[in-house]
Amino acid sequence: LNTFAWLKELKRIVKLEGSIWIHATYHNSGFVNVCCQLLGLEIINEIAWYKRNSFPNLSGRRLTASHETILWVHKGGEKKRKYFFDYEASKAFYSSSDLLKEKDKQMRTVWDIPNNKSKDEMKFGSHPTQKPLRVSERILTLCGVKDGKLLVPFAGSGTEMVAGLNFGMNVTGFEIDNEYIEIAQKRLEDTLQKKTSLFK
């Protein structure tokens, strides 16, 4: 899949008030960064998601990969910074599992979020690159808008979409693998059922 092409399409459809969050690894983060710059997508922050419980390197030929890069970008450029950012929520955010984030202090660009998923997140199956729900929840805490729109172009098992539904957003996702489409559908149906039962 052509990274430049899908980023170009995201730039075309995202609103000035919106932003784009891209998960990357050491294999492709540099290339994604360059594509963003060539397209005029300004990088707001580069976040290092630190995974304390990352898998060990079994080959003994390199360091253990214990972080992933998340790029936060927008299309307005330096002169049109209209993207939404809930600064107060970023300061107030607190999680006992994050040993780096202090309550009522500015959120930093290193996030300490364990990579383990709950049983509820895995009960319908999993995806090889599935992220914990807590990662998406933190992102939406910073820039999600209730009743706003969330597009997930690589939906996988639906984690980001589940987070969006829990946040009260209108979600749309794309996925080409039928196995993961089925998992995502079950997770979304389960999430909607839980939300509906709260108001009965």
Label the model's feature ranges.
Residues 1-174, 179-181:
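Core catalytic lobe of class I
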Residues 184-185:
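Conserved SAM-binding loop
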Residues 188-200:
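Positively charged, low-complexity nucleic-acid-binding target-recognition regions
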